[in-house]
């Protein structure tokens, strides 16, 4: 006869598995509609503090946070651009997953709205990958700033090619 406590543990682990699968689909769908259908990010911010406040409102999501210094701005103000992870899970996401090119185009389109007067080549870009919450799903590498900058350069070149298709 099976041990009753073992049965309870098995039942709990099945419930946990089902719960994590449901969470995955909930966040996947939510990110899809936020990031792709509406062609939007969660916001454009002038400080990391504003950015962090917004991230606290969405504790279940991963983000890629782009920080731009716009050369057209006389005061060279830093602008922080917050993008949900499904759109761009890491700066190299589009290289790993070619069917994400549609999302990459949307991201570039949105960024172009912010920096209409500047071409991609003229942007000064730095990037931080931010993980406010850990899921058992896609795991992005934690990049150093140098690695991230290099990855972003490659991404922008790749995305620039996609935009011209």
From Swiss-Prot:
Compartments, record wording: Host membrane
Listed GO CC annotations: host cell membrane; membrane
Keywords: Host membrane, Late protein, Membrane, Transmembrane, Transmembrane helix
Induction behaviour: Expressed in the late phase of the viral replicative cycle.
Residue stretches spanning the membrane: 16-36
Principal place of residence: host cell
Membrane topology: Single-pass membrane protein
Lineage top rank: taxon: Viruses
Protein family: Belongs to the asfivirus F165R family.
UniProt protein name: Uncharacterized protein F165R
Native source organism of the sequence: African swine fever virus (isolate Tick/Malawi/Lil 20-1/1983) (ASFV)
